[in-house]
Amino acid sequence: MTDWTERYRPTTLSAVRGNNAARDEFIEWAESWDDHHESVVLHGAPGVGKTSAAHALASDMGWETVELNASDQRTSDVIERLAGRAAKNATLAGAVSGTTSTRQLIIMDEADNIHYQYDRGGKQAVTTLLKDANQPIVLIANEYYDMSRGLRNAAQDIEFRDISARSIVPVLRNILRKENIEFEEAALKQIAEVNSGDLRAAIKDLQTTVEGSDRITVDDVKTGGRDRAMGLFSFLDSVLKEDAAEEALQNSYDVDETPDDLLKWVEDKVPLVYDDAELARAYEFLSNADIWTNRVYATDYNYRWWRYATDNLAGGVAAARETQRGGWTRYGGAPYRSTRDSTRDTVVREVAKTGGFSMATARTAVIPFLSAITHLCKPRSLTVGMAAWYELDEAGVSYITGSGETTKKVASIVEDAAERRSEAVEAHAGSAFAETETEEKTNFTGNQDSDVDVQSHKSAESGDDTVRTANTPAEDHAQSGASETASATESASDSDASTDTDADDDDGQAGLSEFM
């Protein structure tokens, strides 16, 4: 299947949506180029139409194009040989005639990323090229101020702003009509809003959602797994096909998945795209990412190691690719069982609803913390309290603790949690599990058959010091709100910090604080 972002790329500037002011300024630059011979930088967020505008302008002006992509090595020799030859040689494509219709538009993508070792000398070569060229040159950048001062001073700049959802919807509507696919208008609006002004991502999500269907509804969008800041398939395209290492790494921060899940996705899908040599290099980076991910668990859930895993699985795998790739890739489903994926989504919703967190916070911060302090259902009393507070079933307890779903241990924990909830209701407590000190010994630590020893009971009565000692790294993670997970963990941190100082607090999170 052809990639819709390529099939429906605008062929004329009048079809470029959402940046009318930038479009008009770009046209003026081109039409007056003979007077100023100045190059131009188109800058703005990914997916707002910068590259499409450059190609559409060339089509409107009757200019040929010479393109130097981020995937090309951009040393001074390469730049002078490829782009310099087109810009300086007046005989190319009949430019000797001096007519504008025979000019060549030189397009250099990702001009803000000319800094890797293989681009050594590239910045100076481009700066020199901009000053001496007698052909129009367009530089394309996501971050204008990541470009060197020399490049910025040598070219005019035009900013492309994020495209509003209102401007994205007509584009999606037009595509579906050409594809003879029926649609609900609300579904298109939802896709446009989810993609936060990124037209390219919206088109990719649209194609993913309607794949194999002749109709798209709101329910299709809701169940399509696209409630992420950046879609997983857009992220995979970024890493495996489109973007340089730095941009791929930045995009990984916008995906609402933990690094260990992203690792599974990239590892599962990279063979669909890379050739043998690229695949060998990519697997080296994935192996490194796996080592860093395992170190998180080997160090009592020290999440600072995740950053190194992400560097390898996103930036490293992107760097292993020799060229950019276009076209459509059928990535297929999740790399792990769909039942597990469904369980995860259910648990995320329950934790978010009960704790008053956002879905993103529950998924990337709270659940990893709960997994750390209840790993393999230990300590049992804490696991029972968690299951009771969040009303988890066996699948939910199994998912968070990493235990087998059908084990007797998990089943007994769920039964005890249900009993705990019943007792709390009967006691008419202001908070479900904020028991008195007397009740705490019976309810929080469990009955005399509990696998927690007498010393653990005493510790629970005095503030659960034993549990704190056993789980210090995870506890510290929740209290510190470490930047490696998310600043949004403050709600979980506040609940934890209140255990000692606000045990009698009667707000909605008191039960969670007590169980922590």
Curated annotation (Swiss-Prot):
Compositionally skewed regions (Acidic residues) per UniProt: 497-508
Record keywords, A-Z: ATP-binding, DNA replication, Nucleotide-binding
Binding site residues for ATP: G44, A45, P46, G47, V48, G49, K50, T51
Biased composition (Basic and acidic residues): 454-467
Any single GO BP term: DNA replication
Domain of life: Archaea
Presence of the UniProt keyword Transmembrane helix in the record: no
CDD domains: AAA (cd00009), HLD_clamp_RFC (cd18140)
MF terms in GO: ATP binding; ATP hydrolysis activity; DNA clamp loader activity
Start-end of Low complexity biased regions: 479-496
Region spans: Disordered: 421-516
Protein biosynthesis among keywords: no
Gene3D superfamilies assigned: 1.10.8.60, P-loop containing nucleotide triphosphate hydrolases (3.40.50.300)
Coiled-coil positions: none
Function: Part of the RFC clamp loader complex which loads the PCNA sliding clamp onto DNA.
The protein's assembly and partners: Heteromultimer composed of small subunits (RfcS) and large subunits (RfcL).
Family to which this protein belongs: Belongs to the activator 1 small subunits family. RfcL subfamily.
Protein name as it appears in the record: Replication factor C large subunit
Source species of the chain: Haloquadratum walsbyi (strain DSM 16790 / HBSQ001)
